[in-house]
Amino acid sequence: MKSKSSMPLPPGVTLTRGKHLQGIWVADGFRFSGFDAVVVATPAFKAVERSNEINERAIAIKGIQDALVVALKETGAFASVVIRADEVKAGSRFAVLETTVFEYEKGGGGARYFAGVYGAGQPVIKVRGNLVDSKGAPLFVFEAHRSGESATARMFGGFRSDVEIQAEDIQDLGIDLRDFVKALVSGH
């Protein structure tokens, strides 16, 4: 499947649908080994910027970075997972995970109250991740789309905040990435 986002993919990369990630690509032979560390860079934001979403957007951006750090630490694939390149020990071989939010909506409680079970008013976040080596060559690319995925977001979303629901979605995104990486590392 080609990516449905308007963001171009790196040359030679074609995303395929994963079990829980909407798009995945892994460089031939890459299995998340051979690196001492990974730097999880601050996510870029390339979605529509709405003036009523400033605070929620900032929370989501920080939440994505935090969730990805936790996810990659839990894989055990890297000795060190950091957020800045200057935190990597000198002489270490490291990769960088660059992420971009390419679609974002904070959601709306009123719509969730009346039709949230059908997806109305749910927050939306779509993220592209690109793990690159020190020369910028892509090693792994993923795309994840979340929109009020949990049962509580659907059933009781009208009584919950946009931030709470989106935080669950972001945590779920991290868990799905962790599980994919762990499966790849273990050969499954």
Task: Tell where the protein language model's regions lie, with residue ranges.
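A structural "domain/chain start" motif
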Residues: 1-66, 156, 182-188
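Surface-exposed short loop/turn segments
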Residues: 4, 84-138, 150-160
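N-terminal post-signal-peptidase region of extra-cytosolic proteins
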Residues: 17-28, 77-85, 109-116
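Sec-exported extracytoplasmic/periplasmic mature domains
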Residues: 45, 69-78, 106, 178, ...
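Extracellular-facing segments of soluble proteins and assemblies that are Gly/Ser/Thr-biased and enriched
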Residues: 59-92, 100-105
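A structural microfeature
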Residues: 140-142
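A short acidic/small-residue loop/turn micro-motif
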Residues: 146-148
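Compositionally biased, intrinsically disordered linkers/stalks adjacent to structured regions
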Residues: 155-188
